[in-house]
Structures are given as structure tokens and as C-alpha cells.
Design a protein with these regions (language model features):
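Active-site neighborhood of HAD-like aspartate-dependent phosphohydrolases
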Residues: 1-50
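Asp-based, Mg2+/Mn2+-dependent phosphohydrolase catalytic module
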Residues: 1-9, 116-117, 130-133, 138-238
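Residues at alpha-helix caps and immediate loop-helix transition turns in enzyme cores, especially N-
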Residues: 22-25, 29, 107, 137-138, ...
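Hydrophobic alpha-helical core bundles mediating ligand binding, dimerization, or RNAP-core interactions
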Residues: 26-34, 51-56, 72, 90-98, ...
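A metal-dependent, Asp-based hydrolase signature
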Residues: 45-95
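Short, acidic loop-to-helix structural element flanking the phosphoryl-transfer center
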Residues: 65-70, 84-88, 95-126
Length: 238
């Protein structure tokens, strides 16, 4: 049962609302991106290496610039490309070809039920997905579980955030953007490292175990956790 103080539920996307096995999804995603970028002179391996380099730079971002600025700065340095030419190509990819990566993900009809059910009960619902993708890439992935950007009061993407998971400052940034206190929020995610970083800001956490990521073998006995369906019961939606 949700604590009476909670007014806002923060949902992770990948592995939480959208079931996936990360390695399979990433391989599919990079394969599609390499096909898109090939006509622009990018060989697959250097392209993937440059994207990873830009992604790692975003993960280390310290709040001094938006994540997209950090990504494009590093990516263009690594490739010698120009953002003004490449950014529209990437955005077009996330609108179109990226839909092919849906095949690497699972179905979750309960995602829409959870978001709509919580909103019907008066909760604010935030999409607290790691902001390493552009907004259009988030929108595309949401569509695979029947949701839209407009279903959330805040969506974290690389355009509007300056930190990433697993930095606790990411959760502080959410609190600033929503005007909420930590005890008013609940973080719902599947990563026992990245999502539990919310605890360092005083935000309670519920871990979804269907696609659980627990690389450090953390003892979950002290945390509320369960399948997505069990979360619905926990939230009073079933």
C-alpha cells in the first residue's frame, strides 16, 4: 500500500514499464543505428564506439550543461562530424527506424493500466527514464507500451536534464523540477543500483523484479519489491 504522504510516482522506462533484456535490446538498437548512419560515411564499429563515448560522458555529467550538449560535444569530437548535419539524422532515426527495436522488447499491457490508474487516483506520474536519449527516442519507446509523453507530468530526456542515473543528483533534479519533497515521491524501477540511488535523496523505492538488474547481488529484503502485477496490488490498483 502506498504511503499516504506520496503524491508522485516516478517510473523508470526500460525494464520497468517496457520489458527488455538490455543486452539484446542494445545490440538491436545499435544495428539499426549503424544501418541508418552508413550512408553518411560511418562504419559500424567507430559509430558505436563514439555513441558509447558520448553516452558515458552524459552519465558523468555534473549539472554544468544539458546531457544533449555533453553528448554532441563528445560525439562530434570523436567522429569529426558536425552536429547541425548529424542531429537531424539521429532524430529521424528515433522517429522511424528505431521502431524496429520493439522486436527486442516484451509486452506490458499493465504499464498503461498503472499510469492511468494512478492518475485517476490523483497522483502525479513522472517518467524517470535515464536521460541519455532524446525526447523523440523516449516517445517512441513509450509507444511500444501504449503510452505517450502527455501521460506524464515530467519526462526526463537528454534535452532537459543535466545529470543521469546513477548519480543521486539526477533525483535531486527531478525534485527541483516537480517542486516535490522526497517523502512525497516513490521511485519505481528495475535496477538495484541506478534506481535505488533515489534513496540517497530520501525518495523511497519499489523494485520491479520481472526484468531485475542486480549486478551487485544486493539484498532486496529491506526494499518493497515484486512483479509489475504485484506492484499494481501494492499501489491499490488491483
Amino acid at each position: 500500500m502506498l504511503d499516504p504522504q506520496i503524491t508522485t510516482v516516478l517510473f523508470d522506462l526500460d525494464g520497468t514499464l517496457l520489458p527488455m533484456e538490455v543486452e539484446h535490446f542494445t545490440k538491436t538498437y545499435f544495428g539499426l543505428l549503424a544501418q541508418k548512419a552508413a550512408p553518411y560515411g560511418f562504419a559500424p564499429e567507430p559509430l558505436v564506439a563514439a555513441v558509447w563515448k558520448g553516452t558515458k560522458a552524459m552519465v558523468k555529467n555534473d549539472g554544468t550543461m544539458t546531457n544533449d550538449r555533453r553528448f554532441w560535444e563528445v560525439f562530434c569530437q570523436a567522429t569529426g562530424g558536425e552536429e547541425s548535419l548529424l542531429r537531424p539524422v539521429f532524430d529521424g532515426f528515433y522517429q522511424q527506424e528505431f521502431h524496429g527495436a520493439k522486436a527486442a522488447c516484451g509486452e506490458n499491457p499493465l504499464a498503461k493500466q498503472a499510469v492511468e490508474g494512478l492518475k485517476a487516483k490523483g497522483y502525479d506520474v513522472v517518467l524517470a527514464t535515464n536521460p541519455i536519449f532524446p525526447r523523440v527516442g523516449v516517445e517512441t519507446r513509450l509507444s511500444w507500451v501504449g503510452l505517450t509523453l502527455e501521460d506524464f507530468s515530467l519526462v526526463t530526456s537528454y534535452e532537459n536534464f543535466t545529470t543521469c542515473k546513477l548519480n543521486p543528483a539526477y533525483y535531486a533534479e527531478i525534485l527541483r523540477n516537480t517542486g516535490k519533497q522526497p517523502q512525497e515521491c516513490l521511485m519505481v524501477g528495475n535496477d538495484a543500483v541506478e534506481d535505488t540511488a533515489a534513496l540517497e535523496q530520501g525518495i523511497p523505492v519499489y523494485l520491479i523484479t520481472d526484468c531485475l538488474l542486480n549486478p551487485q547481488g544486493r539484498d532486496l529484503s529491506g526494499l518493497p519489491h515484486g512483479s509489475f502485477r504485484e506492484f499494481l496490488a501494492f499501489a491499490g490498483l488491483e
